[in-house]
A protein has these predicted regions:
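Secondary-structure transition/capping residues
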Residues: 57, 105, 109, 136-139
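Generic surface-pattern signal
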Residues: 9-12, 103, 130, 173
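Glycine-rich phosphate-binding loop used to anchor ATP phosphates in small-molecule kinases
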Residues: 11, 17-85, 121, 128, ...
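Conserved nucleotide-binding/hydrolysis micro-motifs of P-loop NTPases
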Residues: 63-64, 87-92, 142-144
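NTP-dependent small-molecule kinase module
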Residues: 127-173
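N-terminal phosphate/diphosphate-binding loop that engages ATP/GTP or pyrophosphate donors
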Residues: 1-13
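A glycine- and Lys/Arg-enriched "phosphate-lid" helix/loop adjacent to the NTP-binding pocket
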Residues: 76-124
Length: 173
């Protein structure tokens, strides 16, 4: 906590206007980075950007409730929020893709973790959509990604396909 507090000055208005200055200050040469430390840093940065009212975007599996809380806070602070949600019809597709990534020297994720995150993320989808000004829902189960629907203000649904994937019906509509 103390170490992260030391990086608080990175987010002064002067520093935000100079991207190379920010990047230089975010180099942690003396720290062996692990996924937990990286997630704490990312959360700190997101909350700081909200605090100083700067626009930002981030990628997440959305498998923990803190992302819903972040959307709530952003909405309370007057941010316009957009969600680009991409899922597959089955967690085994994701498992297969991770195995392929490992073959290509990418990082591995245990199968049980992939499956658990898959269902937790889908479980948060409806609440996340309700908190957004606009949500774009995609299915990435096959080679071609399908744009399923666009949802405005958490209510108005504009379907982009004739056949709705089962996961969309089950977890969103």
């Amino acid at each position: 906590k103390k170490m992260i507090k030391e990086y608080d000055s990175i987010f002064s208005n002067n520093n935000l206007d100079n991207k190379s200055n920010i990047l230089q200050k975010l180099i942690f040469d003396d720290i062996k980075i692990n996924s937990y430390f990286a997630s704490v840093c990312a959360d700190f940065i997101r909350k700081k950007l909200l605090e100083i009212r700067k626009s930002f975007t981030f990628e997440t599996v959305m498998s923990s409730y803190d992302k819903i809380e972040l959307l709530k806070l952003a909405k309370e602070l007057g941010y316009k929020t957009y969600l680009y949600y991409i899922a597959t019809s089955d967690p085994y597709i994701n498992i297969s893709r991770v195995k392929n990534r490992v073959i290509l020297k990418g990082h591995d994720v245990p199968e049980d973790k992939i499956t658990n995150r898959y269902y937790r993320s889908l479980g948060f989808l409806k609440e996340a959509v309700k908190l957004t000004n606009r949500a774009y829902i995609f299915d990435n189960s096959s080679i071609e990604t399908s744009w399923i629907c666009e949802i405005t203000d958490g209510k108005l649904v504009d379907m982009k396909v004739n056949t709705i994937p089962k996961w969309v019906n089950e977890y969103l509509l």
